[in-house]
């Protein structure tokens, strides 16, 4: 009898995972193409998520709340990768690993509270300095 919980060949499991992942990606692309807004004269080569029109004349300093929120998202999103790696090895790390993870999460929460108090998460307000 096998020690594995799942009675499936690891190569078959990998093939199923890759096929499902590719299918989900293809489905998302097809649904996005069907649901997107189709405008006459739209330029498909122009990025639309940056918050700044690339052809617009410069009229002073750029208000960059979008870029700040995006940078904060990337910074705080990295914690997920780090905590996922910890969760995979949680049984092996024992109490010391749990304390390390708690300190890491505590530091992240302190950073979040600081950013919240500083106004960095407010989209339309000027930041307090």
Swiss-Prot record:
Catalytic activity: a quinone + NADH + 5 H(+)(in) = a quinol + NAD(+) + 4 H(+)(out)
Entry keywords, A to Z: Cell inner membrane, Cell membrane, Membrane, NAD, Quinone, Translocase, Transmembrane, Transmembrane helix, Transport, Ubiquinone
Protein's UniProt keywords contain Transport: yes
InterPro entries linked to this entry: NAD(P)H_OxRDtase_bac/plastid (IPR023043), NADH_UbQ/plastoQ_OxRdtase_su3 (IPR000440), NDAH_ubi_oxred_su3_sf (IPR038430)
GO CC aspect terms: NADH dehydrogenase complex; plasma membrane
Annotated compartments: Cell inner membrane
Membrane topology: Multi-pass membrane protein
EC number: 7.1.1.-
Enzyme class, first EC level, given as a word: translocase
Described purpose of this protein according to its UniProt entry: NDH-1 shuttles electrons from NADH, via FMN and iron-sulfur (Fe-S) centers, to quinones in the respiratory chain. The immediate electron acceptor for the enzyme in this species is believed to be ubiquinone. Couples the redox reaction to proton translocation (for every two electrons transferred, four hydrogen ions are translocated across the cytoplasmic membrane), and thus conserves the redox energy in a proton gradient.
Similarity section: Belongs to the complex I subunit 3 family.
Assembly notes: NDH-1 is composed of 14 different subunits. Subunits NuoA, H, J, K, L, M, N constitute the membrane sector of the complex.
Protein name: NADH-quinone oxidoreductase subunit A
Organism: Rhodopseudomonas palustris (strain HaA2)
Gene behind this protein: nuoA
